[in-house]
Amino acid sequence: DFIDSQLIHVHTTARTGIQLEDIKDIVIHYVGNPGTTAQNNRDFFDKDDTEVSSHFVVGLKGEIIQCLPLWERSAASNNRNKDTISIEVCHPDGTGKFNDATYTSVVKLTAWLLKETGLSGDNVIRHYDVTGKLCPIYYVNNPDKWEAFKKDVKTSLAELKEK
């Protein structure tokens, strides 16, 4: 109930309808355009000429919009589109740091996805880990904060498994 499903339409690159081969990792991204909302980014993915997409976008108020079914490929992580679920995250400024509401929702969503897919907390990676792109920039520039994020996801996953 915490996810607002607004699937984008099938078109060219952003949503091809091609099935994932397997799900091996959850990839965290940042949108790269400070101050934009989850809805802004979802609507951008839905344009016919857009060549990128993500399974989820997490907004500045902590809202979560699902853009693609979990079983379909996104256009977000280059050669890893075939085996990853991608989460794009909104941020208020150029540092790329997530605000508290956004951070809380990203942790919750990531843990839920790990539980749903049977993956572990070790299966959470940055776009940077796939391509070397500075994404999400805050967590590339602050590896200690990335480790803290992954620890928070593992804690949340453990709590979900207890329920």
Predicted ranges, named:
Residues D1-H9, T13-T16, L20, P92-K163:
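Basic/polar, cationic surfaces and motifs that engage anionic cell-wall
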Residues D1-N78:
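N-terminal catalytic cores of peptidoglycan-degrading enzymes
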Residues I28, I85-I87, V124-R126:
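Hydrophobic faces of well-ordered beta-strands that scaffold small-molecule active sites
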Residues G32, R80, I85-T95:
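Cell-envelope and extracellular/periplasmic
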Residues D43-F45, R73-A75, N81-T84, T102, ...:
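General N-terminal targeting signals
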